Amino acid sequence: MSSGKHGKSGKIIFLKVLSGKILEYLPSKTIFSQGEQCKDVHYIEQGVVKLVLVSQRGRSGVLGFLGRGDFFGEACIGGHAIYQTSAITMVPSKILVIERKKMIHLIEKEPHVCTQFINYLLSRNHRIEQDLIDHLFNSSEKRLARVLLLLNDYEKGNENPSIIEFVNQDTLAEMIGTTRPRVNFFMNKFRRLGYVHYTHNGGLQIYKSLSKVLQ
């Protein structure tokens, strides 16, 4: 769901914005809600965030998932008065909050940063389109594999399997839009194939070989 290219661009911008406020969130916490005043840009230092849209009829849908190195809430830069979606953490997350004025100042004073940020936004929009296609046409097994790879940041160049301790099967089922029994079935399959490993304390280790499921 994320590419190394725009992840690096986001990191460059982040390094230039050191005066932001860092907030830490537990899983399932709302960072901002749809309809709230749109006044800050957010950058994910650590964690996974889902963007949720609620229709006028009250139906909700997940627009996409964001991981380390991603921005969200950037609509405030373009003059949007309210957030068009809600942002909710899926795992423990560390978020850098950048004031709108500071972000605009950075973009105006650093032309190359402006170019990088535009490229990032275009890449991010393309990824959200791919997420929607994924939900509409791909199997639950492939959606689960993509989410697990996102959790370990493999798509941003990380080569080593880290241990994920805060994601249960109910959360994974919510993330990919299926049931817990289906997630359990696929997780057992991934374990038998050596794509994932459960640690003695209940943590989950995800191996890059899981990407074979997406082929």
Where are the predicted features?
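Regulatory nucleotide-sensing modules
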Residues: 4-46
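Cyclic-nucleotide recognition modules
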Residues: 12, 18, 64-126
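A cytosolic small-molecule/anion-sensing beta-strand core signal
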Residues: 26-27, 45-46, 67, 91, ...
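Local beta-strand/beta-hairpin segments that build beta-sheet-rich folds
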Residues: 31, 63-64
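Glycine- and acidic-residue-biased ligand/ion/polar-headgroup-sensing regions
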Residues: 39-52, 57, 67-69
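Polybasic "coupling" helices that flank or enter modular domains
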Residues: 108-177
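Phosphate-/nucleic-acid-contacting segments
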Residues: 153-215
